[in-house]
């Protein structure tokens, strides 16, 4: 009996994650080409910028995760903007069993990974409804994005320390 209690105490806690809700916090689709009265077949050159944010909510073990996309589409080879699409898509998650030192990466990697398919569909539908071919976003490597942001923050902190010295 004591052996089973000791074995249970040594096992890491079971990670539990539930999506409690997801929603569009803010969205803007500016159809610049249509406002100018222009039409026709143009090859788009699409630029997608991704930002992530995580906030603890007042309820225990609940977090709000936001994926913020800023998408600009220009006519290929020109500076003419076709459309600008900004969306702030959020999910409310209940997370348990994640050690504190792993919580931040978990929230900014695993939670956005769960939300992304829904966000991709919204982007596709809105661009199609805006009169363009549906924009089917490629998968985002949230782990690489997290590591890149962490490296950028560390480099900025080092540069700040050198400037203060």
From Swiss-Prot:
Task: Identify the keywords attached in UniProt to this record, alphabetized.
Answer: Chaperone, Cytoplasm, Protein transport, Translocation, Transport
GO cellular component terms?
cytoplasm
Q: Which InterPro entries match?
A: SecB, SecB-like_sf
Q: Is Chaperone included in the keywords of this UniProt record?
A: yes
Instruction: Name one molecular function that GO assigns to this entry.
Output: unfolded protein binding
Q: How does it assemble?
A: Homotetramer, a dimer of dimers. One homotetramer interacts with 1 SecA dimer.
Protein's job: One of the proteins required for the normal export of preproteins out of the cell cytoplasm. It is a molecular chaperone that binds to a subset of precursor proteins, maintaining them in a translocation-competent state. It also specifically binds to its receptor SecA.
* Family the UniProt entry places it in: Belongs to the SecB family.
Annotated protein name in UniProt: Protein-export protein SecB
């Amino acid at each position: 009996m004591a052996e089973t209690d000791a074995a249970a105490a040594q096992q890491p806690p079971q990670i539990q994650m539930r999506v409690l809700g997801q929603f569009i916090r803010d969205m803007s689709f500016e159809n610049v080409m249509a406002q100018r009265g222009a039409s026709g077949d143009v090859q788009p050159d699409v630029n997608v910028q991704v930002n992530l944010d995580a906030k603890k909510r007042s309820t225990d073990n609940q977090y709000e995760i936001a994926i913020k996309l800023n998408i600009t589409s220009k006519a290929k080879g020109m500076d003419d903007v076709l459309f600008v699409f900004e969306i702030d898509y959020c999910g409310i998650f209940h997370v348990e069993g994640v050690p504190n030192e792993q919580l931040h990466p978990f929230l900014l990697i695993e939670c956005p990974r769960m939300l992304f398919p829904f966000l991709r569909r919204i982007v596709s539908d809105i661009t199609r409804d805006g009169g363009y071919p549906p924009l089917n976003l490629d998968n985002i490597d949230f782990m690489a994005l997290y590591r890149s942001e962490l490296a950028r923050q560390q480099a900025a902190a080092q540069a700040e320390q050198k400037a203060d010295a």
